[in-house]
A protein has these predicted regions:
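Catalytic cores of alpha/beta
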Residues: 78-93, 137-149, 184, 188, ...
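Glycine-rich phosphate-binding active-site loops on the catalytic face of alpha/beta enzymes
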Residues: 19-21, 43, 72-77, 96-110, ...
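Conserved N-terminal beta1-alpha1 strand-loop-helix module at the mouth
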Residues: 1-95, 128-132, 140-148
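Short, electropositive alpha-helical surface patch
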Residues: 64-72, 120, 127-128, 202-213
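Short, surface-exposed connector motifs at secondary-structure boundaries
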Residues: 39-45, 123-129, 180-184, 205-207
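Alpha/beta catalytic cores of nucleotide-metabolism and tRNA/nucleoside-modifying enzymes
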Residues: 21-23, 172-234
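Hydrophobic faces of well-ordered beta-strands that scaffold small-molecule active sites
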Residues: 14-18, 49, 68-71, 101-103, ...
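Active-site-adjacent beta->alpha loops and helix N-cap segments on the catalytic face
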Residues: 28-29, 50-69, 80-87, 105-123, ...
Length: 234
């Protein structure tokens, strides 16, 4: 898809994350479940899909005509990085035709000792036309990734790193600061549980937003309800 056309398509819209890890109820070895989630999202007005693994991305692209943010989650020894960590995953994602390639953009080092900024520069050198999103946790890392060539920075990892531990809600001030000062387009992602929060994130300056657990993870949604009910009984 043409870059400017993609920007126009997702601006101000909802991208739905359709993922199921092996430990989750909706995971199957054969796949086929996440494409159904993606179809439901597309029917309801989603402007894009975020997906994990080449299999799910390929299956999703067969059933919906929406831009896909692609990632590969994989743990590596010696690093907390797990979202598109090495060039091997990058090569696989580019080969399956992801519209936006997302990588972890936090402060930890990759297995080869490279920083997030160095990794993004390497991706852009190898695939200069590939749109890249950095999943960040704080302002400094987001700026470093943007300056390295990331087209998008996401708030994806805020609250999930040692430096941001304890942040359990969408940080609208952080979104606004990035939208005001960062040269990359800002995608609000993480801790968005309600439609009102999504609207507020866009009002804070987000270019677009990603919502996953509140839409496509039934176990998480159920736990939110049962947790509230059980708390009220005490």
């Amino acid at each position: 898809m043409d870059k400017e056309k993609l920007f126009a398509q997702i601006k101000g819209g909802l991208i739905v994350s359709c993922q199921a890890l092996e430990t989750e109820p909706l995971y199957t070895k054969e796949g086929g479940v996440m494409p159904l989630m993606a179809k439901a999202a597309a029917m309801s007005g989603a402007v894009g899909i975020r997906a994990n693994t080449v299999r799910d991305i390929t299956q999703i692209k067969q059933v919906v005509d929406l831009p896909v943010i692609g990632i590969i989650k994989k743990d590596y020894p010696g690093t907390p990085m797990y979202i598109t960590v090495t060039m091997k995953e990058v090569d696989e994602l580019v080969a399956c035709g992801v519209d936006i390639l997302a990588v972890q953009g936090t402060g930890a080092l990759r297995p080869d000792g490279s920083t997030s900024a160095q990794f993004i520069r390497a991706i852009k050198a190898k695939y200069p036309d590939q749109l890249v999103m950095a999943d960040c946790d704080n302002f400094e890392n987001a700026m470093a990734c943007a300056e390295a060539g990331a087209d998008f920075v996401g708030t994806t990892m805020r609250g999930y790193t040692p430096e941001t531990q304890g942040i359990n809600d969408i940080d609208f001030e952080f979104v606004h600061k990035l939208a005001t000062e960062c040269p990359a387009k800002v995608i609000a992602e993480g801790h968005i549980h309600y439609p009102e929060q999504a609207v507020k994130a866009l009002e804070a300056g987000a270019f677009a937003l990603v919502v996953g657990g509140a839409i496509t993870r039934p176990a998480e949604i159920t736990a939110r309800f049962t947790g509230a009910i059980n708390a009220a009984k005490k």
